[in-house]
């Protein structure tokens, strides 16, 4: 009888000890939280609200039920968004912007209070569209291409300044895509065609001018040659002309002699006399 009571007492004490250990393990487990690399934690206290200090990497203690950690990723993350903006000459332009952002670590408690954990998704698209529309409105549509480095620099400076108002740090800002509306694209094509036609017309005019100059030079040369021949004739008489005529006749006779389909008939009536005999 005594042994049974001792066994029951032992089991009861063992159950109490196991329950105590389990409760202690649960409390200990809920009192610990881990912050991984590239993260920071903001502690919310039910009595004091959001704590001013952020918690760094590693395992830390908190008061169960009264305190709760909220983990922020502080590594640089890419974000891409598009905006349709109007230019100074009232053309619609579609731009795509890529930014690399991260939160300002010392301001994480304030970011959590005002924006929450998804601060970047709430802020960046809004201020990105705002800055793009403001900058694009300062340029004509064609200037966005010819002055693209200047446009990108203005967008970068304005967006970095605007993001600081929300305690967000931008490591890089870049315009990755730029396209125009259908009407402007058609106008650009027509302008290119017109420029090509103008260049072609300019070439035709230059060619005609060169041909005209060549004709003038050729006419002047022929005039000078005729004058020289006239002067030579006046000095030497008709002998020069007869010499040129003989040379031309010799060239013609030489050409005809080499042709197999040409027969030479001597002048006069001697051939006719030979036929009559």
From Swiss-Prot:
The modification N-acetylglycine is found at residue 2. The keyword Cell division does not apply. Keywords: Acetylation, Cell membrane, Cytoplasm, Membrane, Mitochondrion, Mitochondrion inner membrane, Nucleus, Signal-anchor, Transmembrane, Transmembrane helix. One of its GO terms (biological process) is mitochondrion organization. Residues 29-277 are mitochondrial intermembrane. It is found in: Cell membrane; Mitochondrion inner membrane; Nucleus; Cytoplasm. Component of a prohibitin multimeric complex in mitochondrial membranes. Prohibitin probably acts as a holdase/unfoldase for the stabilization of newly synthesized mitochondrial proteins. Necessary for mitochondrial and cell metabolism and biogenesis. Required to regulate the ethylene-mediated signaling; involved in growth maintenance in the presence of ethylene. Functions in nitric oxide (NO)-mediated responses and in hydrogen peroxide-induced NO accumulation. This is Prohibitin-3, mitochondrial.
């Amino acid at each position: 009888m005594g042994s049974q009571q001792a066994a029951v007492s032992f089991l009861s004490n063992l159950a109490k000890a196991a329950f105590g250990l389990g409760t202690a393990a649960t409390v200990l487990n809920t009192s610990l939280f881990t912050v991984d690399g590239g993260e920071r934690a903001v502690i919310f206290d039910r009595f004091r609200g959001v704590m001013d200090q952020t918690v760094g990497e590693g395992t830390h203690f908190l008061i169960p039920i009264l305190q709760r950690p909220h983990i922020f990723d502080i590594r640089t993350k890419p974000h891409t968004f598009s905006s349709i903006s109007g230019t100074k000459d009232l053309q619609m332009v579609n731009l795509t912007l890529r930014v690399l952002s991260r939160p300002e670590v010392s301001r994480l408690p304030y970011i959590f209070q005002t924006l929450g954990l998804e601060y970047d998704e709430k802020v960046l698209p809004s201020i990105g569209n705002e800055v793009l529309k403001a900058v694009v409105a300062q340029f004509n549509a064609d200037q966005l291409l010819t002055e693209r480095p200047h446009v990108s620099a203005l967008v970068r400076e304005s967006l970095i300044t605007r993001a600081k108002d929300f305690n967000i740090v931008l490591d890089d800002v870049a315009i990755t895509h730029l396209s125009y509306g259908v009407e402007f694209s058609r106008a650009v094509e027509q302008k290119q065609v017109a420029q090509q036609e103008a260049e072609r017309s300019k070439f035709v005019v230059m060619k005609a001018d060169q041909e005209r100059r060549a004709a003038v030079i050729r006419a002047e040369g022929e005039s000078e040659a005729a004058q020289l021949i006239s002067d030579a004739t006046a000095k030497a008489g008709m002998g020069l002309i007869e010499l040129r005529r003989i040379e031309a006749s010799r060239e013609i006779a030489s050409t005809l002699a080499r042709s197999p389909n040409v027969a030479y008939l001597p002048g006069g009536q001697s051939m006719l006399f030979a036929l009559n005999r």
